[in-house]
């Protein structure tokens, strides 16, 4: 009995020591993939399937698309043999790395022929059939097996989905490639050249001005090789339904989420209606690629508006640009990094849903910008401890380099588990899993100069303090550092892996210390919660009856209650840190979610209840009054989706919709997501360049929205 008591005491003291000063080890066996919507504590690993690992050589040169494989791996735009089975075989490696979500490049059937010399759809972004798996990668059985095994290893699967376009074509050569051909589970639908009566594609030429919203969304992508990508018309009911069915099929096969390609290049109304239909099937995670449009550029507000209103989260290109400038080219300082953290925190309603990254398949790898591995380690440490969920491009932990496409898409060179980067990622993955401050917490700058950034993440009483010195030649004396860490001594969570040190804290002050050249130090504290604490509600948009996941702490093991705007929700499942509930039947609009457990209520978290199942509608107003440079036309109406008569155009949730486009001036149009089969009232207004508002005259327009996948509502401006 005395031995048992002593063992218990020693174990308790060791646990307390870990809480205050060291690393809580990452236990991959404790990971779970039960909640598709929840990625706050995850590390995402982005994989180009063809370039990861060849697990099945029998599909390298399939009969359906014979001759597209290059066994020498010297032709960078040919297939090189990676497949779904290869990803499955490397799940143990990914699990050891601490990965809890994999993001797969597009898996659906791609172009069966060459698009010019030695140019194939190896990357997956030239989809010809959205209902079949690409034969170089496997089949639906292979996909299902991968998803099942990933889930068994506590790893979620996000699939890249490409609804903007089909395949390459040349407007002056109908024999080139497949002419943009589209298939539905093997049945031919049409191509760019036999589309006169179908309207499956946009026929407005190629994009020349990428900052022009009309061109970017209603014209074709162009490729440096001299061809175009056939731009799909999401306003066409057949296409909208086809794409929606394809996305639903992926979810039905177990996908935990979708990364939606090129969301800035098709109308946002389709995005929102697609998200709604997917969320009705399952509480999954959706993230869109809105490339570029950083703060200060022409369409930055449109990106923010999209992220706040569409129900689709976005990849954080704003922060990515600054990360690469701060740690890569050194053209910006730590002040710029802190400023961007603050700006995005103010602009994005759900900043914790942003996906952060240092590089990806569309830009040069970090080590080709800066070959110093120490700076790579610093950049990784930042995204692994900052707000949002980090996405690590395959091979980064193996120090892969490579310039722009296609040279950033080399074959995975090794699966070495001893590299410093591998150890860094696996260790900080444990921190993300075990400390709610990283998953949900606020960010506060605690000490800064051009080279050093010390920031604190805090969620109630959980705290993580991070210090990064990007200067690999100079150390810095750190004094006057304040923190929310409790009194005590704290070891570096990374155990000195990146040159870090321990600290002592007394009454909110950190004893002076020297931060070594190039060093990264991480100190953390976590404790049990005495009251329910909501960190996240996901998805953050949907209709009554949908399932949503509430993540946080202190919910207890005895079921309490969850309310949406005071209306009690039915609980599906309840654990101490995760609750699943059904959205209650209540009025549409932004509402507050609250958890009550043990008679104590939580903090509030916003959720957007839709007015009903969504459909995307082309709203056109003809013969609008003359406008001048800087004037914009918006739509508002009597439902939250149209702003509830608001003239706020800031990009906040449920504000006025727009701005509209005018390729046929003075007629204006855009596509908005509204509840299907509902009678609505609406009006248009002009927001002049000086901020003044000019409303339409006359009575409100009244219309009943369509019940199908898409529709059109056209009115004339009332003078």
Swiss-Prot record:
Question: Which Gene Ontology molecular function entries are recorded, alphabetically?
Answer: alpha-amylase activity; glucan 1,4-alpha-maltohydrolase activity; metal ion binding; starch binding
Query: Which residues are in the IPT/TIG domain?
Result: 532-608
Residues that bind substrate, according to the entry? 126, 165, 259, 264-265, 292, 362, 409
Q: Please list the residues that bind Ca(2+) 2.
A: 109-110, 112, 134-135
> For Ca(2+) 3, which residues are the binding ones?
164, 217, 231, 265
The record, for SMART domains, names:
Aamy (SM00642), Aamy_C (SM00632), CBM_2 (SM01065)
The signal peptide here is 1-33
Q: What's the EC number here?
A: 3.2.1.133
Write out the residues that bind Ca(2+) 1: 54, 56, 59-60, 81, 83
What is the protein's quaternary organization? Monomer.
Q: What is this protein called?
A: Maltogenic alpha-amylase
The source organism is Geobacillus stearothermophilus
């Amino acid at each position: 009995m005395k031995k048992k008591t002593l063992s218990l005491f020693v174990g308790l003291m060791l646990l307390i020591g870990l809480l205050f000063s060291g690393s809580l080890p990452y236990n991959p066996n404790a990971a779970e993939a039960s909640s598709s919507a929840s990625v706050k504590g995850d590390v995402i690993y982005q994989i180009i399937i063809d370039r990861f690992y060849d697990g099945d050589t029998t599909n390298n040169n399939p009969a359906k698309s014979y001759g597209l494989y290059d066994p020498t791996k010297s032709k960078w735009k040919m297939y090189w043999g990676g497949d779904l089975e290869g990803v499955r075989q490397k799940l143990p490696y990914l699990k050891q790395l601490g990965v809890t979500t994999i993001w797969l490049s597009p898996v659906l059937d791609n172009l069966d022929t060459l698009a010019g010399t030695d140019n194939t759809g190896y990357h997956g972004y030239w989809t010809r059939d959205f209902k079949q798996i690409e034969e170089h990668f496997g089949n639906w059985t292979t996909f299902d097996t991968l998803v099942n095994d990933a889930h068994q290893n506590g790893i979620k699967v996000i699939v890249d989905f490409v609804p903007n376009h089909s395949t390459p074509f040349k407007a002056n050569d109908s024999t080139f490639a497949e002419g943009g051909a589209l298939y539905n589970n093997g049945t031919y639908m049409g191509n760019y050249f036999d589309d006169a009566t179908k309207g499956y594609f946009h026929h407005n030429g190629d994009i020349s001005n990428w900052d022009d919203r009309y061109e970017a969304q209603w014209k074709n992508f162009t490729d440096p090789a001299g061809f175009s990508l056939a731009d799909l018309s999401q306003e066409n009911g057949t296409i909208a339904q086809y794409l929606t069915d394809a996305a639903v099929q992926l979810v039905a096969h177990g996908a935990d989420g979708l990364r939606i390609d090129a969301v800035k290049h098709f109308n946002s109304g389709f995005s929102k209606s697609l998200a709604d239909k997917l969320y009705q099937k399952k509480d999954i995670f959706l993230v869109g690629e809105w490339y570029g449009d950083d703060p200060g550029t022409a369409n930055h507000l449109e990106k923010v508006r999209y992220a706040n209103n569409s129900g689709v989260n976005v990849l954080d290109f704003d922060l990515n640009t600054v990360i690469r400038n701060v740690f890569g080219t050194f053209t910006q300082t730590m002040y710029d990094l802190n400023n961007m953290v603050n700006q995005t925190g103010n602009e994005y309603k759900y900043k914790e849903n942003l996906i952060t990254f240092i590089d990806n398949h569309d830009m040069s790898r970090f080590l080709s910008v800066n070959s110093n591995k120490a700076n790579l380690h610093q950049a990784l440490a930042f995204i692994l401890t900052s707000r949002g969920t980090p996405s690590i491009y395959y091979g980064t932990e193996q120090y892969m380099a490579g310039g722009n496409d296609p040279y950033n898409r080399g074959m995975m060179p090794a699966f070495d588990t001893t590299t410093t980067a591998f150890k860094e990622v696996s260790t900080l993955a444990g921190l993300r899993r075990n400390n709610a401050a990283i998953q949900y917490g606020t960010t506060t700058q605690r000490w800064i100069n051009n080279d050093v950034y010390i920031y604190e993440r805090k969620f109630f009483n959980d705290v993580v303090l991070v210090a990064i010195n990007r200067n690999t030649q100079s150390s810095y004396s750190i004094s006057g550092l304040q923190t929310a860490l409790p009194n005590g001594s704290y070891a570096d969570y990374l155990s000195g892996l990146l040159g870090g040190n321990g600290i002592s804290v007394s009454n909110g002050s950190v004893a002076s210390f020297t931060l070594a050249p190039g060093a990264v130090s991480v100190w953390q504290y976590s404790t049990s919660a005495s009251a329910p604490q909501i960190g996240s509600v996901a998805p953050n948009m949907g209709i009554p009856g949908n399932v949503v996941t509430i993540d946080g702490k202190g919910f207890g093991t005895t079921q309490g209650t969850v309310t949406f705007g005071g209306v009690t929700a039915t609980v599906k499942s309840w654990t101490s840190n995760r609750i699943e509930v059904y959205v209650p039947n209540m009025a549409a609009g932004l509402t507050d979610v609250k958890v009550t457990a043990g008679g104590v209520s939580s903090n509030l978290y916003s959720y957007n209840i839709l007015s009903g199942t969504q459909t995307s509608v082309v709203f056109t107003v003809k013969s609008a009054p003359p406008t001048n440079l800087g004037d914009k036309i918006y739509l508002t109406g009597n439902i939250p989706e149209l702003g509830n008569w608001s003239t706020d155009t800031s990009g906040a949730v449920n504000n006025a919709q727009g701005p509209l486009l005018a390729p046929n001036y003075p007629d204006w149009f855009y596509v908005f997501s509204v509840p299907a089969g509902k009678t609505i009232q609406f009006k248009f207004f002009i927001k002049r360049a000086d901020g003044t508002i000019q409303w339409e005259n006359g009575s409100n327009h009244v219309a009943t929205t369509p019940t199908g996948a898409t529709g059109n509502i056209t009115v004339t401006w009332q003078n």
